[in-house]
Structures are given as structure tokens and as C-alpha cells.
């Protein structure tokens, strides 16, 4: 199931390509376009911290990262995280898109592509773990039909030292089928 999950995906001009070393410099430029956003992320992809975070993302166990492309242009990143074969679950996270494509429906298309694929290969549950302060991302997953299950209090310490409360959102396969 998880071998089939981490596949390159596409829908017209939207493509998810397995993130690789060859994407480093293009992604560095994309992430630098919104340096103010990184304090609400667990790790920073700002210019000062980019290389360490990129190395962790592409080399980390339990992480299946993608470069997000709009045509031939790299516009962001996302990943499958926390695969749990016994629960047939996965998290979608580490998502960032360039400010130019926010508010255009691109992120909704991206998430729907990932969700459709995950459920097609046998995943039963998809989670989104979002910093409570990140209202934009919470609104986006609510719009997809996800359910907020609660808040994991003091769940992690971010790169800034902030003790983060994490909103836990989920979507089940049978819920998605009913919405599609």
C-alpha cells in the first residue's frame, strides 16, 4: 500500500514530483518568497535554516516529500508523513505553496489529488496536524470536509522554541466517497 502511495501524481498543469536534491535551489527561492510564514511551522525553510530542513525532509524516515509544480514551475512542497500500516493511515503535511498560487484554488486541487490517490491505494484515514495559530490551513482542510478531532496541547516545540498546540484534523475514506 505505502509503496503505491509515494508515486508521482498529476492533474493538468498540477504535478507532484518526488522531491530530490535537484529541486534544492528552486525550492529555496520559493520558500524565501514568504519568510514571515515560517514561525508557525515546526521547522523553518527560511534562508538561514533552509539547507538543514531540506536535508531532513528528503532524508527522513517516514517522510515522502513532493515538489509541487504548476506547469514547469516549482511552486511549493508537501509530503506524506507518519505512515501507519496497522491503522492504514497517513498524514499530509509539510505543505507550503508560493504566495502567487494561494487563493487560486490550486491548493484545493493539490489536496484533492493527494486524497483521491491515498484512498485509491487503500488508505483509510488521512490526518492533518496544524499549528493552532495557522487559521488559513485549518480553514482549507475544513473546506475539504475534514473533521477537527481536537487539540493536542503542548504537542511539540517548534524551531523558534514555541510550545505548540496542534489541531488534529482527519478525513476517512468513506466520508470522502460520500462527498465526491
Q: What are these regions, as identified by a protein language model?
A:
Residues 103-117, 139, 143:
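Conserved acetyl-CoA-binding loop-helix of GNAT-fold acetyltransferases
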Residues 120-130:
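Conserved GNAT acetyl-CoA-binding A-motif
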Amino acid at each position: 500500500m505505502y509503496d503505491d502511495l509515494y508515486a508521482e501524481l498529476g492533474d493538468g498543469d498540477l504535478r507532484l514530483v518526488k522531491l530530490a536534491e535537484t529541486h534544492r535551489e528552486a525550492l529555496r527561492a520559493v520558500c524565501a518568497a514568504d519568510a514571515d510564514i515560517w514561525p508557525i511551522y515546526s521547522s523553518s525553510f527560511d534562508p538561514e535554516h533552509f539547507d538543514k530542513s531540506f536535508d531532513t525532509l528528503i532524508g527522513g524516515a517516514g517522510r515522502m516529500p513532493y515538489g509541487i509544480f504548476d506547469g514547469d514551475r516549482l511552486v511549493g512542497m508537501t509530503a506524506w508523513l507518519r505512515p501507519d500500516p496497522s491503522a492504514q493511515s497517513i498524514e499530509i503535511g509539510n505543505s507550503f505553496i508560493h504566495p502567487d498560487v494561494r487563493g487560486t484554488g490550486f491548493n484545493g486541487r493539490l489536496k484533492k489529488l493527494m486524497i483521491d490517490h491515498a484512498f485509491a491505494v487503500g488508505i483509510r484515514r488521512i490526518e492533518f496536524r496544524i499549528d493552532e495559530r495557522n487559521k488559513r490551513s485549518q480553514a482549507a482542510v475544513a473546506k475539504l470536509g475534514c473533521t477537527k478531532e481536537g487539540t493536542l496541547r503542548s504537542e511539540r516545540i517548534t524551531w523558534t522554541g514555541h510550545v505548540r498546540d496542534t489541531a488534529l484534523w482527519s478525513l476517512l475514506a468513506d466520508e470522502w466517497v460520500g462527498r465526491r
